[in-house]
Amino acid sequence: MIRAFSFPVSPERGRLRGWLEGSLAGLCELHWLRERQEYRVQQALRLAQPGMGGAEAEDEEDADEDEDAAAARRAAAALEEQLEALPGLVWDLGQQLGDLSLESGGLEQESGRSSGFYEDPSSTGGPDSPPSTFCGDSGFSGSSSYGRLGPSEPRGIYASERPKSLGDASPSAPEVVGARAAVPRSFSAPYPTAGGSAGPEACSSAERRARAGPFLTPSPLHAVAMRSPRPCGRPPTDSPDAGGAGRPLDGYISALLRRRRRRGAGQPRTSPGGADGGPRRQNSVRQRPPDASPSPGSARPAREPSLERVGGHPTSPAALSRAWASSWESEAAPEPAAPPAAPSPPDSPAEGRLVKAQYIPGAQAATRGLPGRAARRKPPPLTRGRSVEQSPPRERPRAAGRRGRMAEASGRRGSPRARKASRSQSETSLLGRASAVPSGPPKYPTAEREEPRPPRPRRGPAPTLAAQAAGSCRRWRSTAEIDAADGRRVRPRAPAARVPGPGPSPSAPQRRLLYGCAGSDSECSAGRLGPLGRRGPAGGVGGGYGESESSASEGESPAFSSASSDSDGSGGLVWPQQLVAATAASGGGAGAGAPAGPAKVFVKIKASHALKKKILRFRSGSLKVMTTV
């Protein structure tokens, strides 16, 4: 029957197993209560009888009473000793329970049929026969087993799966006395019940009656589990080698304990020693494999003399229980001391590696993260052909540090040298692609700009900031207004913009434009006054009008941020647009013959921040997509 429970069980089977064990514990409890009641009835009958034959009966009664009194005294002393050691033992029990209850089904496989429910739980022999009185130990006091049946039933389940001792087996069974001394089981084990009594059944009932305290009574499940064939095959306690027989059992169970508690030492820990690592470090020797093995070894010398003394019966129960408590305290002592020290030095090499790998580099990465990220991502915009639009959100914070022209994007005026360097840098990356632009007529009536102009977006914030600073109303200005304003404003300065550099080298005129014509909308000036003047030199370049126009408008774009918004008043974007009538002339590339005034239409947009960013990001496609009027 029990083999069904020995492999790892599903939750439902675990619950069923708990119920079965609880009901078995209740049966054992009832059995013991019945025995105790029978004993009381016999005592009452014996008192009622006047005498069973004179001196014989009196002597017999005196002997019984002496034995009962001695047993009661021994039990009281043991209980007192145990009560003193209770807090530490209960704490240690909680730690071990928390540790060992993690794996539910493994112990039965290791220790053989250790939960011997099937052996003799239902036997109904006399009170002193070993099969029946293994249930009759004081371990089955009401509070204990009923508590197991009740709220703390899971604890009972786990307790039955711990490495178990014979501490709950009956004092009446001859073989169990040495076993109780031998096995460091639960912390109710220090019941040295029949340790001092010569007869196996001498103190069974009186002692049980004396020891039926409310706590420290082991669970009946331990007694049931300890009826396994391994412990039961040992010789009786009276035999001279009882102590020697206790030792192998002790070694076996403590080895079981060590093996179970240390099992997780090499396994990877999912957490680098955080909140949930704490209790596990406290309660298990598993985290301290070096300590685990010597601790039971060092405790065993203290335990073995007491075993031998128990075998020869001279040990007093108080001393025995004291030895028990001390040995278990010594075994449990390293555990409370260890938790503070556990995090700092990793105990096992595997664990140290794990903690270092997960925890310490995490901290270093946290400290290094921001500078590392900044250093890693700064270079790409500085490489020549690289598009700056890969990281638009970062424009403003790093603008001034990255390129010279970003100083204007932040609203500050850079030096002409910086502007020159930035312009030539971006232009050189685009010069190779300029000739690849088809010179056919543009698809839409807009000024044609080369498609691959990604480095322009860095100027996106410039008109944005200028437009926001200008704060004028958002509206479309008619072509007439723009013509009038720009004609009035730009005529005197337009030639100065044309003079400095010839068209075929686009970088030169645009460099001059940035600071030579800073106060004006050089786009407007180019469109209104000097289409002829600009296109004359630029005619040799394929798509001359489109290229020079686009490079002029883009080269001038930083000037928007600083000066054009001031002179312009509305701070919008000014886009030159070819009317359909002039499309053929401008698209054909014969810039010199293009009509000057009415063919060029400007639409000045007071656009939102997002719209301007989009327009400036896609310089060529933006007009076609968004602002065709």
Curated annotation (Swiss-Prot):
The keyword Cytoplasm does not apply. Residues 63-87 form a coiled coil. Residues 56-69 have a biased composition (Acidic residues). The modification Phosphoserine is found at S6, S165, S239, S426, S478. Residues 536-546 have a biased composition (Gly residues). InterPro entries: Dapper (IPR024843). Residues 50-76, 105-574 are annotated as: Disordered. Keywords: Coiled coil, Methylation, Phosphoprotein, Wnt signaling pathway. Residues 336-348 have a biased composition (Pro residues). Residues 105-150, 316-335, 525-535, 547-568 have a biased composition (Low complexity). Pfam families: Dapper (PF15268). It comes from the Eukaryota. The keyword Phosphoprotein applies. A motif (PDZ-binding) lies at residues 626-629. GO terms for molecular function: delta-catenin binding; identical protein binding; protein kinase A binding; protein kinase C binding. GO terms for biological process: canonical Wnt signaling pathway; epithelial to mesenchymal transition; negative regulation of canonical Wnt signaling pathway; negative regulation of cell growth; negative regulation of epithelial to mesenchymal transition; negative regulation of Wnt signaling pathway. The modification Omega-N-methylarginine is found at R258. Can form homodimers and heterodimers with DACT1 or DACT3. Interacts with CSNK1D, PKA catalytic subunit, PKC-type kinase, DVL1, DVL3, VANGL1, VANGL2 and CTNND1. Interacts with DVL2. Belongs to the dapper family. The C-terminal PDZ-binding motif may mediate interaction with the PDZ domains of DSH (Dishevelled) family proteins. May be involved in regulation of intracellular signaling pathways during development. Specifically thought to play a role in canonical and/or non-canonical Wnt signaling pathways through interaction with DSH (Dishevelled) family proteins. This is Dapper homolog 3. It comes from Homo sapiens.
